[in-house]
Amino acid sequence: YIVGTPFGKEFAKKIVVDLKEAIITKENKISYINRKIDKNPQITIVGESIMSESLAYAISTEKNKTVNVISSLETDEKLLLKGDKIAMFEDDIEKCLKNSKTIIADPLFRPICPLDSNFISLPHEAFSGRIYRDEIPNIINKSL
């Protein structure tokens, strides 16, 4: 199997290559594993681990930005890159975000983000349910 969500054009291409390779090698692979982590990222993504890591890879590849992830749901740590975090409680997430410049997250996380941060709303049904369903963009195999 291949782990990853094909966000963006470049990451979608990488997943296709990884799938073809996995057919031949019979080895599982996490497609976003080679993304670079930065202690002071330009962007922080809060959300479910695989989708967030995939989006982080896509943004770092297509936009040449440093991106880190905070998984706000319980997840296997092997699905996160070293340096990314798991924070499931609001207080913990808020602490992780205190120095974040740009944050991509479900709109329900906005109240715990620093007031001076640039907040980019990315609704997810696991968090806000159907409230913002009409605002969920389709970024699969699309330029970011």
Protein language model features and the residues they cover:
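An N-terminal assembly and electron-transfer interface module characteristic of large anaerobic redox
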Residues: Y1-L144
